[in-house]
UniProtKB/Swiss-Prot annotation:
Record carries keyword Glycosyltransferase: no
Name of this protein: Bacteriocin rhamnosin A
Source species: Lacticaseibacillus rhamnosus (Lactobacillus rhamnosus)
Subcellular location(s) of the protein: Secreted
Domain of life of the native organism: Bacteria
Stated role: Antibacterial activity against the Gram-positive bacterium M.lysodeikticus. It may act as a pore-forming protein, creating a channel in the cell membrane.
Predominant subcellular localization, coarse grouping: secreted
Length: 13
């Protein structure tokens, strides 16, 4: 799940 999409979600948080 993505927390706030940093750029393009580097390592899928």
């Amino acid at each position: 799940a993505v927390p706030a999409v940093r750029k393009t979600n580097e390592t899928l948080d």
